[in-house]
Amino acid sequence: DHPTPVIDLARVFSDTQRGRLEESLDEVEERTGWKLRVLTQYERTPGLAIREFWGLDERSLLLVADPRGGNLLNFNVGDAYFAMMPRTYWVELQTRFGNQYYVKDHGEDGAVLDALGAVEICLERGRCQVVPGLPLEQWLWTLTTSVLGGLIAGFAAYPRKEGETVAWAWLLLLSP
């Protein structure tokens, strides 16, 4: 009934969330010139009519949230986006925020909002090769493996012969 960047057929968002999201997406479009649109669907889907309704072009991104598949998020990406964010970015974005574990922990609304937030960060920066932000689990895993690797290297490098400062042979043998 009014021009909107959000069509919430699946009722993923509360009225307040939808209103804030509409304002945010309109503001991003005014500020950057890039169109971001959100469609949530379940049983009912507008199909290809949505392209004409929103006038999607090469500077448009359509995020489709549909829980019927294995991944909540799908993206219809305008060609101009690929100059700033490669195809691998969109795959990473989909797998990070649309997987069933993330959706279970953050809800469908959180997954959509977080994915859009990552895109907005990249639009502000002007370019992204990878999705910004590091999940806590990945950060902890990286820290743990780094510390463990340091301990192994330290023990391996400990001199075994008198006059030797570093046991290079053992260090190289046990290094990854």
Language-model segments: what does each one mean?
Residues 1-149:
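Folded, non-transmembrane soluble domains that reside on the lumenal/extracytoplasmic side of membranes
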Residues 148-175:
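Juxtamembrane interface at the cytosolic side of transmembrane helices
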